[in-house]
Each structure stands twice: as C-alpha cells, then as structure tokens.
C-alpha cells in the first residue's frame, strides 16, 4: 500500500524536526525498505544538531565526522549558555514582564528596558539562541525564547519567522493548546492584508500551515472536527489544497465521515472537488465517499472501505482512528443502502458485516432507529422492509431550492473577486449563463452546498497584551522547512 501512503508528500512540507516522527513511524510499517528509511533519516538529521540520534545510525566512518561535530556543538552550547544567562535573569524579573505587558509601543520598549540590561543585541540573542536550542531538540526552552523574542522585537518579518518556530516547538513539546493558538495566529497573519506576502507566497504559506496543522488537530480530543472547518475555508485553504496539496483531502474527508451528523453537507463539497480531480478519487477514503453518495455503487464502496482499513492503519495521523472510521463508514454505507432500497436481506447483511444473523438484525434495527427510517422486519422472509416517505411536489421543490440564496451569494462574491471594482456589466452573457448552470446543478441534485466554513479563532493572548507566535521558512534541496538565519 505504498502507493496510497502520504508520508513522502507530507514530509516535503515539514521542518526536519517534524519529519523525524513520521520516519520513525514508517520503520514499523512493512512498506518501505529499511535501508532507504535509515538513509532518509540520516539526511534529515544532518540538517539538525541532533548528533546523538545520528550516532546511533552512523557507521564507523560517519561516526568520526559526527564525533568532531559533537565536540564543536558542545563548545557552541557553552557559549550560548554564557551569553543567555543575563537574558534569562532579566526575563525572570517581574518588573520587566510588567513593562513588556504595559508598553504598547514596541519602539519605546528598548528605552524602557535599558535600566534592566536590555540592549539592541538582546533580541538577536533570543532569536538565534532559540534556533540553536531548537536544533538541539530542547523544544520547551526554544519555545520560551521565541515567546520572549516576539514580546520585545520590532522586526515584523522576523516575528513572523519566529512564529513558525514557536509553532514547531509547541508541536514537538506536545503543548497542543499553545500550538493551536499559534496556528490560528499564523493563519490570521497570512490571510491579513497587512503582510507583505505576494499571492504566490500566501498560497505556499497556507499549504505549509495546512500540513503542520495535522499534528495539532489529530492530537486533541475535539481537534479533528476543526480540520474540516479550516480545510474547507473556500476563500483561502481549499484553494491551496486543490492547487498544491490535494492529498490532504483524505484527512478532511475521513473526519467528515466520522462526524457525518455534523458535517453532512460538506461531504458533497468533497464529491464536487473529486469530480474535478480524477486522481483524488483514487484515494480510498475519498473514493469510498464518491462511490457511496454520488454513484450509489455499493460494491465499489465496500471495496474502497476494505482498502481504507489497511491504508488508515498505517497512516501516521489516522492510525489510532482506524476502527472508529471503519465502524462509522459501515453505518453510513448501510444507511444509504437502506434509503435507496425497499427491502434488505438480513442474511446478506450479516455476511457483509461479518456478524451472525441475530447480531446483524440487532445492528440494523439500531441503525434504522438512529436514522429515523420507517421499517419492519418480516420473520418469514428474513428481510427488512423499508417504507419510503411520500414527498409532495411542494416539499420536493423546497428541498431542492433551499440553498439557492446562498449559492447566489457565492456567485456574486466570486464575480466580485474577479472584478473587485465592480467593473462587470449585467449585459454580459456569461454571467446569466453561469447563474443558470449553477441553478440547474442545484435543481438536478448536482450536490449540496455548505456554508462557508470559518475557522475558529482562539485566544492568542497569554498573561498580557502581547501575542504569542513562531515561524520557519521553507528551504533545502527537498523543500523542507527551515529557519532563516
């Protein structure tokens, strides 16, 4: 199943330190050559100062070079400890912290802190020192240094860079609440109009953030639900995914299926996107959804579901949710099956579910009750008979047109983005043609539309008015994220 493994695609958008957990996960899987994994890990470690880990993998020749580098790093660490000692003492002073919180104008902050030993060089020490300790794997210390750097720095570009670093440090230290706050703060900056990013840079930054967000969302109890809201933000994130990283739709689709009662409408958005990108439909998770609710091809849906079990069990982010996904997907499959069939054989259902007939009957009864279907069991034939509700013409029209107002709004917004100054004419024949096409798709059941998924904002403040944050930029031969020196 290496063909469906996303490790390589995801690693191209991560900092080297974030790549290491994924490579360690791959060691336990029987899909990559062990020697290739070892070589890949050594290449990643060579871009860090994690010499101890590299020594465990190195051969005799490599160890000589690593021993020399280890001695150099040890001397460098002593130098940083000496340089940062007065800085640590200064930030342990409550008066200093009070001044930082109270001073709104960062330009005047330097003069306010001068009596306590703060100089122009202090901010540089915080920034570069955090980079050193991050590379050494001391993520908590690096996070604290970056927090203080962002509190006193007046360099907006470096503060943005530091925000990426702070997010990475929070992820690697398992501080998920702070990581989530940093993630949304980064998104706010990227999407804001005050940054100096070009449209292409914004697109790439969003792409990186979406990949990094997987660590945040899948390591919190209620985190996965937020992934759909973020990924399906049409004005920003959805475009980045479709353009650069369509493989990420696997995660949003999987979460939507697992929480389908709350995310039912958004499933049609995934189907619509998959129709535009045929390769996306090859993904087992997305393919399952398309086969089920678009094609009503239950045989293919079952085949895709079997693939999902194997693929998800080896996915770094979804492995622990495999059973939950399979159980929910089975429920969804049979619910759709019951809605389009008038009778279901209990014996056939038992075979497909891998249950006894009694257990299958009990399982189906519970499903019918939860789905609020009108059905009866016929003991003589061993079948469940489903009574289809009769829908009046008026109700049918209402159901088909209830989202037209929102779809019209989307069209107007799209035209506004194409012509921000309102420079389009109502006589333009392409506009009513586009409107009619969208209307026809809605009336013909071409898919349901969900409202714009606004990502949630968190409370980014900690103990004062200055904000938290951190940042990497992408670099390296393989386009891995790295600090800017």
Swiss-Prot record:
Keyword Transmembrane: no
Cited Pfam families: eIF3_N (PF09440), PCI (PF01399)
GO-annotated cellular components: eukaryotic 43S preinitiation complex; eukaryotic 48S preinitiation complex; eukaryotic translation initiation factor 3 complex; eukaryotic translation initiation factor 3 complex, eIF3e; nucleus
Any single biological process term in GO: formation of cytoplasmic translation initiation complex
Chief place of localization: cytoplasm
Molecular-function GO term, any one: translation initiation factor activity
Domain PCI: 219-391
Keywords, comma-separated and alphabetical: Cytoplasm, Initiation factor, Protein biosynthesis
Annotated S-S bridges: none
Bias kind Basic residues: ranges: 476-485
Keyword Ubl conjugation among record annotations: no
Assembly and oligomerization: Component of the eukaryotic translation initiation factor 3 (eIF-3) complex.
Family indicated by similarity: Belongs to the eIF-3 subunit E family.
Role, per record: Component of the eukaryotic translation initiation factor 3 (eIF-3) complex, which is involved in protein synthesis of a specialized repertoire of mRNAs and, together with other initiation factors, stimulates binding of mRNA and methionyl-tRNAi to the 40S ribosome. The eIF-3 complex specifically targets and initiates translation of a subset of mRNAs involved in cell proliferation.
Protein's UniProt name: Eukaryotic translation initiation factor 3 subunit E
